Amino acid sequence: MNAKIRKMLHNPAASGILIFLAAVAAMAVENSAWNTHYNAFLDIPVSVQFADLTIAKPLLLWINDGLMAVFFLLVGLELKREFLEGELSQPSNVILPVVGAVGGIALPAAIYTLINQGNPAALDGWAIPTATDIAFALGILALLGKRVPASLKLFLLTLAIIDDLAAILIIAFFYTSELSPASLMIAGSAIGTLILMNRLGVTGISGYMVVGIVLWIAVLKSGVHATLAGVVLGFVIPLKGEEPGELSPLHQLEDDLHHVVGLGILPLFAFANAGVSLQGLTPSILLDPVPLGIALGLFLGKQIGVFGFVWLSIKSGLAKLPEGFTWKQLYGVALLCGVGFTMSLFISSLAFEHGSSALVSGAPDMGSARLGILTGSILSGIFGYILLRFSLPKPPQ
């Protein structure tokens, strides 16, 4: 591979840029003569058979239920590593990001709920503006290069990881349909097997993957969202290798998945889910409760919630402002937390999966949700970048 291309792909901003380009491509195709081909592509039936078990889903659901399980596997690996040997292993490093994450979840959810309180069906989308897209937010921050203090980047990363953990819990508790006891028993047996393998010191990743596939199928059939199987699998992958100094299975798998997810799965997910039809679009549609609640939740709720809760915790003596960055820079990061994008799109697919892509006034469907997500995320990204660009130290001449 050309050295310049390799360097570009290893740039932290690469994933965010690809996700953005994929979303732009989806919107361009959806609003062109190729839109029927785009939707037909996402509706392609894909069947996989295991003995007598057949799983048949359109391609879109394979992306959302299957490939996104790989994304959540990576999230599970990162969470385990951070809690056991990373920044989250030190309680003093956790307080401020946790407080910020709580504010960044509570206020957006409250804003959305307040705006949509007259529509019970729309209330299912309350969690959509609570999410933060790690790859996109860090990608925007990476555009500012070495001007960004390490402590500021670490704060955003830690807050986003905690935000992901909250998203996992929200999906598990609030977006689970009717449960299948038989499938849950199989899933429980698979989890027990994975834990036993970990306890016995099994370090071969392939064995965990085989049992993980069984777990994914069981969770898929259980009524719990299948992506949670990825999180569970990530939690049981061993953190230590067989020999001292050897690359552990967790670190190896995390390294292997990092670029697959950031440069492949997330851009593909964005392309499959960001197609918004602009036909008949007028500014008034943004004032409909669903897109308005999501857009304001992401843009206003996130920045005020994150910054406000952090400010209160510091002023009350609960935490300290980390060395190396200022209040203005902290506010810029709070703005970047409003870039919900892929995570918000994912949660909206759970909340409004019954809806069409048509933008119907007041209807709780994917179309109106996507519009709100794109608006809130773009505004948060632009204003966050501008504020950080002017508040960070000037690069050396």
From Swiss-Prot:
| Topological category with respect to the lipid bilayer | Multi-pass membrane protein
Q: Disulfide connectivity?
A: none
Keyword entries, A-Z: Antiport, Cell inner membrane, Cell membrane, Ion transport, Membrane, Sodium, Sodium transport, Transmembrane, Transmembrane helix, Transport
Question: Any idea where this protein resides?
Answer: Cell inner membrane
Segments traversing the membrane: 9-29, 59-79, 95-115, 125-145, 154-174, 177-197, 222-242, 260-280, 292-312, 332-352, 371-391
Q: Name a single GO biological process.
A: regulation of pH
Q: Which Gene3D superfamilies match?
A: Na+/H+ antiporter like domain (1.20.1530.10)
What is the annotated role of this protein in its UniProt record?
Na(+)/H(+) antiporter that extrudes sodium in exchange for external protons.
Q: Which HAMAP family match?
A: NhaA (MF_01844)
One Pfam family in the UniProt entry: Na_H_antiport_1
Query: What are the recorded GO MF terms, alphabetically?
Result: sodium:proton antiporter activity
Tagged with keyword Transmembrane helix: yes
**Domain of life per record:** Bacteria
Q: Does the keyword Cell membrane apply?
A: yes
Family membership, please give it: Belongs to the NhaA Na(+)/H(+) (TC 2.A.33) antiporter family.
Organism the protein comes from: Magnetococcus marinus (strain ATCC BAA-1437 / JCM 17883 / MC-1)
A GO term from the CC aspect: plasma membrane
User: What is the name listed in the Swiss-Prot or TrEMBL entry for this protein?
Assistant: Na(+)/H(+) antiporter NhaA 2
* InterPro entries, A to Z: Na/H_antiporter_dom_sf, NhaA
> For this protein, what reaction is catalysed?
Na(+)(in) + 2 H(+)(out) = Na(+)(out) + 2 H(+)(in)
